[in-house]
């Protein structure tokens, strides 16, 4: 209870860094890009919170980091996605779902943001035009689109179960003691922006490459994302990895 004559405590809310006094928002100018590139060439990447002040930019650290990572890095490719890259995106999406960071980690020079935008504006529509479900990568069955339940023998009806995000978000590797609490979520966070550092593990990388490079129809030879991945071949390598390689920044 609040004592007599006492003041109600004022709750402090954290405000986004871009709303601080004097911080610029909106599109970056050519001059700002040049300042950021010049500073990073001299001082290197990192320490993003203090970088704007050290570089003389009226931007927040997050804005500087995203501008560098998605646009200004020398290794970043912009536009002109090739047919080979498009085919690889389709294969990886069928295997990994909407895990754009993981997908970008397998396509040199492409950012997760660009791949996500290209998927939503081009590839998703392309699959729909071909009669392919962009989520499951299976043919759309026009006969079952409006059927809420499926008839089975004996007249009994069972509802069709929708594809749950748990099929794609929680692929785990058991630590060996049978305790699910010790399982590792090898695909990271729940928002689709995972750390893909573990992909550099040799065994897992070889395992993933063997699936990606499967020869044949890109819609027919890769494990559907509704089925759990069989991770036995690379389990030891992932479980043995350090916690730093599996964690998030």
UniProtKB/Swiss-Prot annotation:
Could you tell me one molecular function GO term of this UniProt entry?
DNA-binding transcription factor activity
Cellular localization per UniProt: Nucleus
User: Main role?
Assistant: Transcription activator, when associated with BHLH002/EGL3/MYC146, BHLH012/MYC1 or BHLH042/TT8.
**Entry GO terms, CC:** nucleus
Report the residue ranges that make up the HTH myb-type domain in this protein: 20-72, 73-127
**Hey, what tissues is this thing expressed in?**
Siliques.
Name of protein: Transcription repressor MYB5
Q: What is the lineage of its organism?
A: Eukaryota, Viridiplantae, Streptophyta, Embryophyta, Tracheophyta
């Amino acid at each position: 209870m609040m004592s007599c004559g006492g003041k109600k405590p004022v709750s402090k809310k954290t405000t986004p860094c871009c709303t601080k006094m004097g911080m610029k928002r909106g599109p970056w100018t050519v001059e700002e890009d040049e300042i950021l590139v010049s500073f990073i060439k001299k001082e290197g990447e990192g320490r993003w919170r203090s970088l704007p002040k050290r570089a003389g930019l009226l931007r927040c650290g997050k804005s500087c980091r995203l501008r560098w990572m998605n646009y200004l890095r020398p290794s970043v490719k912009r536009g002109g996605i090739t047919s080979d890259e498009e085919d690889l995106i389709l294969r990886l999406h069928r295997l990994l779902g909407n895990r754009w960071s993981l997908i970008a980690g397998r396509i040199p020079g492409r950012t997760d943001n660009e791949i996500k935008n290209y998927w939503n504006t081009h590839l998703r529509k392309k699959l729909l035009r071909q009669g392919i479900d962009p989520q499951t990568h299976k043919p759309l069955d026009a006969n079952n689109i409006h059927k809420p339940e499926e008839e089975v023998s004996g007249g009994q009806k069972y509802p069709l179960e929708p594809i749950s995000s748990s099929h794609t978000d929680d692929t785990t590797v058991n630590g060996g003691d049978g305790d699910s609490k010790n399982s590792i979520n090898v695909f990271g966070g729940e928002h689709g922006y995972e750390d893909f550092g573990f992909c550099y593990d040799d065994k897992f990388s070889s395992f993933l490459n063997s699936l990606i490079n499967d020869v044949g129809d890109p819609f027919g030879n890769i494990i559907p994302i509704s089925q759990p991945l069989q991770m036995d071949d690379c389990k030891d390598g992932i479980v043995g990895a350090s916690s730093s390689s599996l964690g998030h920044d």
